Amino acid sequence: EAVQACLDWVLMPANEIIGIEPVRERAITAEKLAINAVMAGCLPAHFPVVVAAMMAMLKDEFLLHGTTASTGGCAILVILNGSIRKEIGARSDFNVLGSSDRATSVIGRAIRLALINILQVSPGAIDRSTLGHPGKISYCIAEDEEGSDWSSLAESRDIPKDASAVTVLAACAPRQIMNEWTSKPEEILDTYAAEMRANMRNYSIWSGNYVVVMAPQHREHMRVAGWGRKEIANYLFEKARVKRSEWATVGKGSVIRDKGDTEYCALPSPDHLLLVAAGGPAGGFGAIIPPWLGTKSQAVTAAIGVCLDCEPPPLTK
């Protein structure tokens, strides 16, 4: 009954194909996905998010097989936007990166269970992660749209303002930062940029979709100074850069060779930054969430429950 309730909520028959995993050509049906959602603890109202997230993950540019089979240890991060956040009780304030509510906890868990049970992405089988990280259990957050002067992440990625949406990303574990000693946007963002550079030296030098999670205290300093998404992204694009010679400082000098002066940027362009407003009200905290091995996998944003680029049905006489 619980599985059927999920299917009824999204108006899908059990045998409807959600998508096909492109490498191994495995079909994911609505029923199989609903079964895993129910096992994860999802209510019917959560299921549209699970469906949209899975559809986004099956896009070629996401490279689902690569992200789930890699030794690199990434997990699937799901970011929620739009009215559905309030409808399902997804919180975006306290403990936002720590499974702060039922909705985000079970949605993230449903994605992981579906990968394991439908696509056999279990440790030691398809999943070859050397270490992994706790986000493999559940990795889902909601953006604090009401507490931010910015347009939402989804809007910045061409989703209409009145549509709910998910953004999926093959993501490493969060790297928390703190800067409570300045109100200047440049100095605050220097702390974020330093953490991005540290990831480039210690994990992967390749550019990709970095997530910046910015809590209210830092956002307020940005607002007072007149800094929005564009200014923040442009600044980090310029500051989050390393030279290959810097690898010598972290024990990787043998791979520098004659490329020591080659400069690498964390972001292919400012538009590749995924800036998310979220977090509790107190404290000068934020987080960097690095991508899995650069641009091999790209973040995908999709509307929930609607098709924005579908062809209209043919007119009938």
Task: List the predicted regions and their residue ranges.
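Non-transmembrane, aqueous-exposed alpha-helical and coiled segments at domain scale
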Residues: 1-317
